[in-house]
């Protein structure tokens, strides 16, 4: 596991520290809380070459502001890979993947790292949780992708209250209208919006040598991956969905999203290196 502090304006490395938490291990996400850093991730991973689901054992760690490790606690009783952590009203909310990546898992913890409750969400097939956000009103949004009751991987987004009760869920995919059996819609991040809804970012495309189709409306091939954004209303209705792509045919996939004060979206894009996409206010 590693923690790297950067100078914000230049990107220069201020400090870098690594920690051996046991076997193949990593921090996946980190937040600040009362002059400490709280990081979640995993250790003792079986699949050390995989960065999506490593078949590891979930952990939560506390570090001081200078990056020195204070303690690490196992969360493996509840989930295999902790992927995101948020702070709300002096509680920690941790989400990630269950054993064998079958379900989304959400934990509510106190600041002494005691688990108050654990909830699972999903269907009968694989449900992979990679994104979480909590809005100012305390609405929790989880997102990722699912094979439950879908023809292939579709985006899977859930709105949850602070007691862990599901308010709504939505599965959406295949924005270009291809044969859904061949299309992967893989979601990586979510941000709550000020209207009680949320916006998710995904990548959409196919990974099959025996399938290749073209979208008449924009000329893209199913083999060309695109950035895929979906805006949900407060009640879970899809308000709009758009794709964004490389006009020269390269692959793009949305990996992370943040919202500006002007209600614009900035998306981190996997384009074979590292890119950014800015979306006008919506």
Language-model segments: which ranges?
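A sequence-level/structural motif corresponding to short, flexible coil/turn segments enriched
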Residues: 1-282
